[in-house]
Amino acid sequence: MTNIRKTHPLMKIVNNAFIDLPTPPNISLWWNFGSLLGICLILQILTGLFLAMHYSSDTTTAFSSVTHICRDVNYGWIIRYMHANGASMFFICLFMHVGRGLYYGSYTFLETWNIGVVLLFATMATAFMGYVLPWGQMSFWGATVITNLLSAIPYIGTNLVEWIWGGFSVDKATLTRFFAFHFILPFIITATAMVHLLFLHEMGSNNPTGIPSDMDKIPFHPYYTIKDILGAMLLILTLILLVLFTPDLLGDPDNYTPANPLSTPPHIKPEWYFLFAYAILRSIPNKLGGVLALVLSILILAIVPLLHTSKQRSMMFRPISQCLFWTLVADLLALTWIGGQPVEYPYIIIGQLASIMYFFIILVLMPVAGTIENNLLKW
């Protein structure tokens, strides 16, 4: 008798995706982050659901409703901090996942890669709107500054901003709609992630060498399920340590002050995972130029496949490209640091140099390095 998991219409889908899936035998720990992102997403939806049961999306009660969750709701504090720090873990996994794709040339799977870029944008939008909900000082001013950037769009900019605000400033209408979008987007992300997975399984996983492994595949279960469980345990351990020992480590103290439209915080800055993009935005003195650079800093990922000049897929055997890749990582860390610093000398010039380096490495140096490596190997 055939196993039910291979015949039942629903079980068959699960079986083909997580049990009998043919997988390369040599994929490393860098391939764990996809499943970790799935775990993060489920965790965020669950904790978010319980927070939404107690949250009030009104400007007069939003801040106190979050305080109420932390003080009066059973284990509300742990749910709130799991959600806040879960977002940080989510972005750590996202950056690692994207970095893996860049290093090992996974971007040659065009559909999977482009859906991944859409997922990254959707996750960033969700995180931004979630940051506004506690209605602290940084929530309010972050929302004001970032939504205001749209006013740089010629002709329709001002109308667009007021349309998003639902008025002439960030107010009750803005908070309510941000809550609505923050609630619905994770479900859209879940559906998109399934499409991401569907396209991935159409072609099969890449592996560290970048060489097709079709003739040498192993089943996903038990080999990679056990590996994913190890990754999940490490992720949850890290998250629990963060939540129980230093829950406010990655947050901003200004967000413990209720939103006040009459008092601007000395330094307006987003959460740490947006600082690199914020630094790129600030490094350009022109408003529209800054907004374009901000969007392009993420959208550049979509054109990475067009810039691939090497005849090898992975960077595993390409030392020049490896050096450039790790320079890019260091540059992103520098941008993250600069994004959190005040706008004054020497931070301005460092930010401008780091921003130029970011685009120069991706658009110029990496394609050139690929061509040089081809010539060195006489290909």
From Swiss-Prot:
A GO molecular function for this record?
metal ion binding
Q: Which cofactor does it need?
A: heme b
Q: Does the keyword Metal-binding apply?
A: yes
Identify its membrane topology class.
Answer: Multi-pass membrane protein
Q: Which GO terms describe its biological process?
A: mitochondrial electron transport, ubiquinol to cytochrome c
Q: Where in the cell is it found?
A: Mitochondrion inner membrane
Superkingdom of origin organism: Eukaryota
Cite the cofactor comment.
Answer: Binds 2 heme b groups non-covalently.
Tell me which SUPFAM superfamilies the record gives.
Answer: a domain/subunit of cytochrome bc1 complex (Ubiquinol-cytochrome c reductase) (SSF81648), Transmembrane di-heme cytochromes (SSF81342)
A GO CC annotation recorded here is: mitochondrial inner membrane
- Give UniProt keywords alphabetically: Electron transport, Heme, Iron, Membrane, Metal-binding, Mitochondrion, Mitochondrion inner membrane, Respiratory chain, Transmembrane, Transmembrane helix, Transport, Ubiquinone
Q: Where does a ubiquinone bind?
A: 201
Per UniProt, heme b b562 binds at 83, 182
Quote the record's binding site residues for heme b b566. Answer: 97, 196
Note the InterPro entries from the entry.
Cyt_b/b6_C, Cyt_b/b6_C_sf, Cyt_b/b6_N, Cytb/b6-like_sf, Cytochrome_b, Cytochrome_b_C_euk/bac, Cytochrome_b_N_euk/bac, Di-haem_cyt_TM
Kindly list the residue ranges recorded as spanning the membrane. Answer: 33-53, 77-98, 113-133, 178-198, 226-246, 288-308, 320-340, 347-367
**Anything else the record notes?**
Heme 1 (or BL or b562) is low-potential and absorbs at about 562 nm, and heme 2 (or BH or b566) is high-potential and absorbs at about 566 nm.
**Protein family:** Belongs to the cytochrome b family.
Assembly with partners or alone: The cytochrome bc1 complex contains 11 subunits: 3 respiratory subunits (MT-CYB, CYC1 and UQCRFS1), 2 core proteins (UQCRC1 and UQCRC2) and 6 low-molecular weight proteins (UQCRH/QCR6, UQCRB/QCR7, UQCRQ/QCR8, UQCR10/QCR9, UQCR11/QCR10 and a cleavage product of UQCRFS1). This cytochrome bc1 complex then forms a dimer.
Question: What does the UniProt record say this protein does?
Answer: Component of the ubiquinol-cytochrome c reductase complex (complex III or cytochrome b-c1 complex) that is part of the mitochondrial respiratory chain. The b-c1 complex mediates electron transfer from ubiquinol to cytochrome c. Contributes to the generation of a proton gradient across the mitochondrial membrane that is then used for ATP synthesis.
Q: What is this protein called?
A: Cytochrome b
